[in-house]
Design a protein with these regions (language model features):
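Residue-level signal for mature regions of secreted extracellular proteins and peptides
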Residues: 13-14
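Mature N-terminal segment immediately following signal peptide/propeptide cleavage
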Residues: 54
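Rhodanese-like catalytic fold shared by cysteine-dependent sulfurtransferases
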Residues: 2-9, 18-36, 41, 48, ...
Length: 132
């Protein structure tokens, strides 16, 4: 019994530390990934959508190549024609990361099953296109 009491803090510490390296995942069902992970997925995956959830004027000022624009404020208000396949991988970003998290949560509630949120374009190191 005494050995078990001495081992308990050690075992609990190991459990806590082992979860530190796990990929971030929201209780609401989407994954949070890093910019580097997003860039790798864009390079390696074939069937994905890059979703920019900023306002149209922000999107026009600069967006990731291939991204489609569905403003966060519109998600959940109507059917999203641009996202017909609810099982398709959707990589979500905004300006700083706040709206993309909100959008990812809404998409999960709408039944989308493969959502990866990677923050904001402010931290994006890859190519950015603008519509001048």
């Amino acid at each position: 019994m005494r050995k078990a009491k001495k081992l308990l803090p050690f075992v609990l510490s190991l459990m806590l530390l082992s979860s530190c390296g796990a990929p971030a995942s929201s209780a609401s069902g989407y994954r949070q990934i890093t910019m580097d992970e997003a860039a790798k997925m864009m390079k390696d995956e074939k069937n994905y959508i890059i979703l920019d959830v900023r306002r149209p004027d922000e999107y026009a000022d600069g967006h990731i190549p291939g991204a489609i624009n569905v403003p966060n404020e519109e998600i959940g208000t109507k059917e999203i024609a641009e996202l017909p396949d609810k099982s398709q991988l959707i990589l979500v970003y905004c300006r700083s990361g706040r709206r993309s998290k909100e959008a990812a949560e809404k998409l999960v509630k709408l039944g989308y099953t493969s959502i990866a949120e990677f923050g904001g374009i402010l931290d994006w190191k890859g190519e950015v296109l603008s519509e001048d």
